[in-house]
């Protein structure tokens, strides 16, 4: 161990000793040797061997390291200085760039604020965020939508552009037009200008908008169409702040492309006819109640107030080239006004039609099957004067005229049977101020879709106003109403004047009024024939006179008639003239002894069935004229020969008689009062009598009106003859009905020749050709009489 310590180089020379000793078994000697070895290892990093032959090499290495560090430090400082300069220069360049960028952005935002109308209208200059927000809103408004959809579509996909245009114009109740800003020439106008201004499109095409507006509004229109800067120079009013400021550079921005235009002007209204079917209800009301500007003189144009709103656009649009023949082609890019014109209905305070617009004429009510009000529209206050609570729980029949109550009850019974179909009836409704208002009620039933039971009846009650209709007093005499049969088939449009013949068809017995036996010496040439209207709101009007219609003191002709009544009472139709068993119309359809059901007497469009009401005046005179033209020496049933009355068939007689029977004067029950017909006796039923077989309405001239006196059971007493006794009541009542030339021919039977067809010329004009004979092939639904063969 001493040798090892004294000579450490020996241990270093033997490389295998160290590891062996160190890795040997633990022991005292080995432990000590291991410690010495560790100590020798620690001393090895020393500079013991550097002292041998090296000298001052230690100090020289340190100097070299210091010099190299100084060089590196100086080089690093130079690099840092250059990088700092570069960074400083870069920062200066970035600041300059940012400053220039901010200046550019500020300039652009300022320009944007001048372009956007909402920004330029502000009194103070807004901040950049406000300018951007207003610019976005303005772009949305120019695009036409308020929401930012992803696909950019702002209209429904199931609508085409044309359908969308029509819907927009219909909803706006206006018309679209495009006008050139430079010349005012109309480039385009929609077809909806016709219902708005009563002018066709052709009057707008090729003209200028200056020609369509009022002369006093031309300067205002030119100002709105102008795009120059000095068009609106001056002072403007700021609506938000209420201050008046001078208009500077904003005028040019306000007049630029895309700026909005909104102005009111007076446009010329035309006189072209407008089809109400082609317009919706709102447009039709606007057309009827279009506001005017005072009274219109004859020959002067009529102007209405129109509100125009739109935008200034570039014309022609991008990608569209004008044709060569266009007058504005080759002038470069121009501007045009795309606007919608709408009527300002409420702008004229002196409009005479405003009361009609504000005053409702109808109200909706709901009833149960009995007719009791269960719901009433609030418009009933302005229509009939009643509050809704005053009508609820009451029957509508209580407010109906006594003469129309049965008609209204029958209509409610029929609408229940129709099950959903609309039934219209006219009656007189008592308003709150005790006035009778002509009211048309269109009713239908609502059925439960599950149980198929009728829940209630819905009625639309319309006040029918007619300025030419004069109020007429009603008959004070009591009336007897016929009962409507269970099989009656009423049409969908039934008025009181149309329902009366149907009720009289189903009446089995009528009151017997004494005194009507025969009218032989009846001078037709002294009685004026009155035309009778068949349609209109005057169905079922009562007579103007409530006294006896056939009193002897009214006319001296009645005394002459009454003197011959008893003398002609016993006259009947001889067997040589008309046999009791012979039928005039033997082609197939005869009259059975039993009354026909009501559905066999249905109405047709052109030739209704023969249901002569007792007041059928012109029918009786017509039969009298036919009776005079018949052959007195004929021994068989009287017929029409071509020499006597060419081309005049029996259906024409029946149709003409019924046409006159459907009179507005012959309302329900007007001629069923016994006191009103003291000189008439109704001795047969309305449809047929027992054992009726013949049609004895045509006799010789010697026994005029003989069918009225023949009351035998073997003959069919037609109701056509009853109309003869009704003629005197219409004499002298000219204020309500005018006599036409068609019926003046009938007043001169003595001068008419058998070959003169002009006796019924205008009467037959309602039925078509006068020379042709009508048969069942032309009227398949007429089963009353077959064609009469000559």
Curated annotation (Swiss-Prot):
The keyword Phosphoprotein applies. Residues 112-168 are annotated as: Required for heterodimer formation with HIF1A. Was expressed at almost the same level in all tissues except for the heart, liver, and small intestine. Residues 673-695 have a biased composition (Low complexity). One of its GO terms (cellular component) is nuclear aryl hydrocarbon receptor complex. CDD domains: bHLH-PAS_ARNT, PAS. Residues 1-25, 465-480, 629-672, 741-758 have a biased composition (Polar residues). Residues 167-171 are annotated as: Mediates the transcription activity and dimerization of the AHR:ARNT complex. Residues 88-128 are annotated as: DNA-binding. Residues 60-98 have a biased composition (Basic and acidic residues). Coiled coil: none annotated. Residues 112-264 are annotated as: Required for heterodimer formation with EPAS1. It is found in: Nucleus. The modification N-acetylalanine is found at residue 2. Disulfide bonds: none annotated. Its main location: nucleus. Monomer. Homodimer only upon binding to a DNA. Efficient DNA binding requires dimerization with another bHLH protein. Interacts with TACC3. Interacts with HIF1A, EPAS1, NPAS1 and NPAS3; forms a heterodimer that binds core DNA sequence 5'-TACGTG-3' within the hypoxia response element (HRE) of target gene promoters. Forms a heterodimer with AHRR, as well as with other bHLH proteins. Interacts with NOCA7. Interacts with TACC3. This is Aryl hydrocarbon receptor nuclear translocator. It comes from Oryctolagus cuniculus.
């Amino acid at each position: 161990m001493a040798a090892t310590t004294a000579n450490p180089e020996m241990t270093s020379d033997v490389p295998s000793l160290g590891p062996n000793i160190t890795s040997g078994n633990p022991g005292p000697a080995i432990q000590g040797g291991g410690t010495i070895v560790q100590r020798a290892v620690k001393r090895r990093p020393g500079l013991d061997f550097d002292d041998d032959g090296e000298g001052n090499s230690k100090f020289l290495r340190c100097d070299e390291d210091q010099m190299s560090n100084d060089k590196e430090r100086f080089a690093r400082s130079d690099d840092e200085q250059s990088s700092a300069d570069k960074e400083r220069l870069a920062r200066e360049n970035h600041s300059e760039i940012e400053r220039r960028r901010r200046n550019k952005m500020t300039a652009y935002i300022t320009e944007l604020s001048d372009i956007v109308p909402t920004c330029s209208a502000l009194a103070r200059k807004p901040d950049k965020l406000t300018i951007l927000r207003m610019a976005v809103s303005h772009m949305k408004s120019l695009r036409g939508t308020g929401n930012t959809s992803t696909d950019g579509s702002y209209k429904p996909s199931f609508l085409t552009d044309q359908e969308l245009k029509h819907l927009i114009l219909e909803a706006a109740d206006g018309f679209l037009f495009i006008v050139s800003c430079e010349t005012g020439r109309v480039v385009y106008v929609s077809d909806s200008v016709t219902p708005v201004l009563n002018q066709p499109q052709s009057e707008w095409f090729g003209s200028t908008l200056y020609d369509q507006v009022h002369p006093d509004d031309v300067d205002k229109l030119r100002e709105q169409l102008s795009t120059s800067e000095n068009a609106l120079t001056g002072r403007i009013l700021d609506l938000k702040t209420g201050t008046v400021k001078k208009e500077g550079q904003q005028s040019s921005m306000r007049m630029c492309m895309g700026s909005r235009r909104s102005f009111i002007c007076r446009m010329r209204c035309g006189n072209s006819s407008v089809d109400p079917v082609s317009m919706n209800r709102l447009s039709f009301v606007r057309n009827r109640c279009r506001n005017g500007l005072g009274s219109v003189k004859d020959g002067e144009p009529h102007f209405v107030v129109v509100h125009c709103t739109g935008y200034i656009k570039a014309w022609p649009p991008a990608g569209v080239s004008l044709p060569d023949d266009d007058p504005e082609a080759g002038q470069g890019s121009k501007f045009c006004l795309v606007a919608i014109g709408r009527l300002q209905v409420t702008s004229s305070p002196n409009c005479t039609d405003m009361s009609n617009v504000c005053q409702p004429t109808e109200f909706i009510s709901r009833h149960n099957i009995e007719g009791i009000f269960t719901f009433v529209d609030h418009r009933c206050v302005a229509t009939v004067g009643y509050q809704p609570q005053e009508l609820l729980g009451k029957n509508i029949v209580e407010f109906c005229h006594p003469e129309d109550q049965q008609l209204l009850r029958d209509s409610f019974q029929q609408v229940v049977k129709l099950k959903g179909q609309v039934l219209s009836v006219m009656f007189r409704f008592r308003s709150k101020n005790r006035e009778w208002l002509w009211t048309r009620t269109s009713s239908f039933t609502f059925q439960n879709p599950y149980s198929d039971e009728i829940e209630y009846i819905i009625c639309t009650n319309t006040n029918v106003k007619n300025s030419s209709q004069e109020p007429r007093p009603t008959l004070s005499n009591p009336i007897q109403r016929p009962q409507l049969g269970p099989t009656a088939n009423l049409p969908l449009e039934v008025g009181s004047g149309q329902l009366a013949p149907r009720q009289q068809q189903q009446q089995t017995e009528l009151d017997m009024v004494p005194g009507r036996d025969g009218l032989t010496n009846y001078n037709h040439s002294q009685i004026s024939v009155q035309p009778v209207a068949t349609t209109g709101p005057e169905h079922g009007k009562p007579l103007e006179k409530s006294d006896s219609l056939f009193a002897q003191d009214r006319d001296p002709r009645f005394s002459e008639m009454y003197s011959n009544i008893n003398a002609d009472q016993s006259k009947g139709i001889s067997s040589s003239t008309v046999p009791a068993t012979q039928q005039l119309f033997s082609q197939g359809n005869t009259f059975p002894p039993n009354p026909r059901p009501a559905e066999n007497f249905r109405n047709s469009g052109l030739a209704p069935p023969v249901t002569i009401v007792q007041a059928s005046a012109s029918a009786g005179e017509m039969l009298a004229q036919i009776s005079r033209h018949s052959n007195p020496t004929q021994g068989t049933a009287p017929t029409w020969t071509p020499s006597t009355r060419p081309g005049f068939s029996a259906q024409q007689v029946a149709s003409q008689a019924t046409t006159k029977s459907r009179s507005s004067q012959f309302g329900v029950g007007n001629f069923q009062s016994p006191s009103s017909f003291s000189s008439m006796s109704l001795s047969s039923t309305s449809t047929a009598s027992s054992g009726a077989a013949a049609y004895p309405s045509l006799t010789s001239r010697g026994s005029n009106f003989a069918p009225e006196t023949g009351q035998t059971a073997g003959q069919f007493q037609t109701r056509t003859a009853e109309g003869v006794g009704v003629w005197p009541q219409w004499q002298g009542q000219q204020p309500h009905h005018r006599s036409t030339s068609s019926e003046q021919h009938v007043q001169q039977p003595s001068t008419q020749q058998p070959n003169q067809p002009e006796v019924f010329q205008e009467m037959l004009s309602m039925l078509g050709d006068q020379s042709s004979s009508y048969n069942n092939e032309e009227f398949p639904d007429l089963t009353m009489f077959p064609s009469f063969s000559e």
